[in-house]
Regions:
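Conserved ABC ATPase "signature" region
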Residues: 57, 286-303, 412
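Helix-to-loop junction immediately C-terminal to a conserved catalytic motif
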Residues: 213
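Charged, flexible cofactor/metal-binding loops and thiol motifs
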Residues: 41-148, 161, 165, 395-483
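ABC ATPase NBD coupling module
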Residues: 43-48, 77-83, 230-252, 266, ...
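Conserved ABC ATPase signature
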Residues: 308-312, 316
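P-loop NTP-binding/switch modules centered on Walker-like glycine-rich loops
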Residues: 1-67, 338, 342-421
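Conserved catalytic motifs of ABC-family nucleotide-binding domains
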Residues: 329
Length: 483
């Protein structure tokens, strides 16, 4: 809107192809430092004529897919190491001898695009071929699985901190002000289940993960955890310093930014040695063999052991962070926006890896993401949070179809698809709130389905649909279906 109103030009750099589809008139696709495709947004995103652009689009999870997308094989060449031929040749299904010996020039097509490819005319067939999809790890036995984690009335608050607050507390002994961020979370998670937490920024998703990891202490409620598959859950200490080795091993957190968990001064060998030595007492040859085995599981070779984090790409760092977490052989892995900083091809590879490890180890995941398509593809159940309160819980397929909570409807309507012809369904004059109302429904002020004073005065009841689908709303499920 600003560009249209002011007439200014804009260069927009992003991994988010959905945002590109909404903002840009033209798109340039770059690979190994070169422009490989340039055209109108519609041309590039709907009928890409370069194999790399085609692979990028095929790597994006979509709300319409029930499975994970296939990741691009291989990795980009190191800077200055592209060779004499096409930089993408080693990863390209169309590559021929000429691709490996002769670098393609950027040429103009009859439709006005510019493309760097010897075989761009053959990509029409690739565009008409359905994308390869990966089956998500089967969880047919979840109905019989025992709970591994139970949250009972979990509430978390942050202390309000500011200059006036500190002065008041010191001079007058006034009470500290706490702002509630997570309120009365009741949730049972089964062993081997993947539960996705979704909601806008400030909804409490990451706060819940930090509390489960022992980095934030709740102000109310309890967390029960089963470490030995016995079905006998015990109280989980609220702070990490109070937890024993078994709890520390069993619960691992993968951060959004892998640099938060990788010591820049340590080699990958030293990073992996920490959990392997601490929890299993491995040394010497046994330590080396286990480290190599773990790296191979995340599709990195033994030669990575001598490298520092600064010598890795973003995707490789995240794979090492995942390897470090799984080195402890955890029962529960907390994934906090683990793919948000990655390009779509690396994201697809990381999601496939998490799915593969879940299938191999029966690991339980709590997966936090803003990307609703990623959550749908990877999760067995989804929890929708608004201002720290649960408003919908249910099987992934059920939450993404009707009936749904009005807030879930707003979230799904705002999804940006990588299609310039697909416009998001935004609520008119919608303004994100900084805090929930004092009483009534947390979503009352923004709700496009608000029905009156009852929304302002009374906390909505939980309504139960099929297969354990729960919606917290004053509107009946039958009416939500009609809406």
């Amino acid at each position: 809107d600003l560009a249209a109103e002011t007439g200014m030009a804009m260069v927009y750099v992003s991994h988010d192809l959905g945002a590109i589809a909404r903002v840009c008139d033209r798109v340039m696709v770059m690979y190994a430092g070169e422009i490989v495709l340039e055209g109108t947004t519609s041309q590039v995103l709907k009928t890409p004529i370069h194999p790399y652009a085609h692979g990028l689009l095929a790597s994006i999870p979509k709300l319409s897919d029930a499975q994970l997308p296939q990741a691009l094989d291989g990795r980009p060449p190191a800077p200055g190491d592209a060779g004499a031929g096409c930089a993408f040749a080693d990863r390209c299904a169309l590559a021929s001898d000429v691709c490996r010996t002769e670098r393609p020039v950027l040429q103009k097509t009859p439709n006005g695009e510019h493309v760097r490819c010897h075989h761009f005319t053959d990509i029409v067939q690739m565009n008409s071929t359905s994308a390869l999809l990966i089956d998500v790890a089967q969880t047919d036995t979840l109905s019989k699985a025992l709970p591994i984690l139970t949250l009972g009335g979990l509430s978390i608050s942050y202390q309000q901190k500011g200059l006036l607050d500190d002065l008041s507390a010191r001079l007058f002994g006034s009470e500290k002000i706490f702002i509630p961020t997570v309120d009365d979370i009741e949730l049972e998670i089964k062993r081997g289940e993947t539960v996705g937490l979704v909601g806008e920024s400030g909804s409490g998703k990451s706060t819940i993960l930090k509390s489960l990891a022992g980095l934030l202490s709740p102000v109310a409620g309890e967390v029960l955890f089963d470490t030995d598959s016995s079905g006998q859950s015990g109280q989980l200490p609220s702070i990490v310093e109070a937890r024993g080795h078994e709890h520390l091993r069993a619960i691992q957190l993968i951060f959004q930014n892998p640099d938060d968990s990788l010591n820049p001064r340590h080699t990958i060998a030293e990073i992996l040695a920490q959990p392997l030595t601490l929890y299993f007492g491995l040394t010497d040859d046994a330590l080396y063999e286990r480290s190599v085995s773990i790296l191979e599981r995340v599709r990195l070779g033994a030669h990575y052991l001598a490298r520092l984090p600064s010598q890795l790409s973003g995707g490789e760092k995240q794979r090492v962070a995942i390897a470090r977490a799984f080195a402890a052989e955890p029962d529960l892995v907390l994934c906090d926006e683990v793919t948000s900083a990655l390009d779509v091809s690396v994201q697809a590879a990381v999601l496939a890896l998490l799915n593969e490890l879940k299938h191999e180890k029966g690991t339980t995941y709590i997966f936090v993401s803003h990307d609703l398509a990623v959550v749908k593809a990877l999760s067995d159940r989804v929890v929708v949070l608004y201002q720290g309160r649960m408003c919908e819980v249910g099987p992934s397929d059920a939450v993404y179809s009707q009936p749904s909570h009005p807030y879930t409807e707003v979230l799904l309507g705002a999804v940006l698809e990588p299609d310039p012809d697909s416009a998001p369904k935004l609520v008119a004059d919608d303004i994100v709130e900084l805090s929930p109302p004092a009483k009534g429904c947390a979503f009352q002020r923004r709700c496009p389905r608000r029905i009156g004073a009852i929304c302002d005065e009374m906390v909505p009841p939980w309504q139960r649909g099929a297969d354990g689908h729960l919606i917290r709303c004053h509107i009946s499920l039958d009416e939500l279906i009609r809406l």
